[in-house]
């Protein structure tokens, strides 16, 4: 776990506030579109959709939920589940979520570990917040699908992605190597986890939102997130959080990594543009340090390439 800016233990005057927190464990945030693979896999596990399902997003990129409107940046037409993730369609994700019964959807999110301590034992760990389904209106269920209305830590998000990486098995988070067998719980069917992981590879393609998260020679599965932050008058268009959560190698997962940027400056603030390249750099070095064999010759996109399709 790495936090920047960090602190210098020899310079006490500069060691204040946020510099002293392990943000990956203590801080929580709305995860945005990084929740979409969790939504898709939950719906598949509940039998609401399957790998061949098609989702209609044809109403001019708009979905009315009561008096509220959910929007996509453009009209994507009919999408398969991989397309919902590749284009990062809010309308598609919300449409899927609204097909699930609230209690069943909540139980799936709970089983992934949202709203619960990971049990890592780090001082000050936050359990985040997952509202109980009994308080959901339809719009709350819809926005949970694309990561608004709950709060998570980076460690919780990594643990949830580790379920997809581990073919549907949830294992406890630990900072210590143990020779004892770890408790484990099956959350997703083996085939569902593999199908979703394959769908997530499309996000890192040139047609997805994160081609800059690609790593030469390795298959990568992941999801971007670009989250509007809350200001004094509600969500603002001036302050963002950029995220990328990913798994590598997607063919035989060994590592999960979550990168989070608070309020990137300038006009470049999308998760695929800001967090994606950092993921590729850190994960690429980690794969080399662990001597993990490449999948094949998968070239990295040119550095000037920007996200195509959706941008969330």
PLM segments and residue spans:
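Amphipathic oligomerization regions
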Residues: 264, 269-285
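Beta-lactam-recognizing serine transpeptidase/beta-lactamase-like catalytic domain environment
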Residues: 1-33, 38-263, 271, 303-312
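Short amphipathic alpha-helical signal-transduction/dimerization elements
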Residues: 165, 204, 280-287, 291
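Gram-negative outer-membrane assembly/targeting C-terminal domains
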Residues: 287-312
């Amino acid at each position: 776990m790495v936090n920047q800016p960090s602190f210098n233990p020899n310079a006490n005057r500069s060691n204040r506030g946020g510099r002293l927190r392990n943000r990956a464990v203590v801080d929580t945030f709305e995860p945005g579109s990084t929740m979409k693979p969790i939504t898709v896999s939950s719906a598949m596990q509940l039998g609401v959709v399957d790998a061949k399902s098609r989702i209609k997003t044809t109403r001019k990129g708009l979905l009315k939920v009561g008096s509220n409107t959910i929007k996509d940046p453009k009209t994507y037409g009919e999408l398969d589940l991989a397309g919902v993730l590749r284009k990062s369609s809010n309308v598609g994700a919300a449409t899927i979520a609204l097909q699930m019964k609230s209690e069943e959807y909540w139980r799936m999110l709970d089983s992934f570990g949202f709203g619960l301590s990971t049990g890592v034992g780090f001082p000050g760990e936050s359990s985040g917040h997952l509202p109980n389904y009994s308080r959901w209106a339809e719009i709350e269920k819809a926005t949970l699908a694309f990561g608004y209305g709950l709060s998570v830590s980076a460690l919780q998000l990594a643990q949830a992605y580790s379920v997809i990486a581990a073919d549907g098995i949830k294992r406890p988070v630990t900072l210590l190597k143990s020779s004892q067998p770890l408790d484990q719980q099956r959350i997703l069917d083996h085939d569902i986890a593999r199908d979703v992981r394959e769908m997530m590879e499309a996000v890192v393609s040139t047609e997805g939102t994160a081609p800059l998260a690609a790593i030469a020679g390795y298959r990568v599965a992941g999801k971007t997130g670009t989250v509007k932050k809350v200001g004094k008058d509600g969500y603002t268009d001036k302050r963002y959080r950029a995220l990328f959560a990913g798994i590598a190698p997607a063919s035989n997962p060994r590592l999960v990594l979550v990168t989070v940027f608070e309020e990137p400056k300038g006009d470049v603030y999308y998760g695929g543009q800001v967090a994606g390249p950092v993921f590729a750099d850190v994960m690429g070095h980690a794969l080399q340090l662990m001597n993990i064999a490449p999948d094949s010759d998968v070239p990295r996109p040119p550095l000037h390439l920007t996200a195509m399709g959706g941008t969330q």
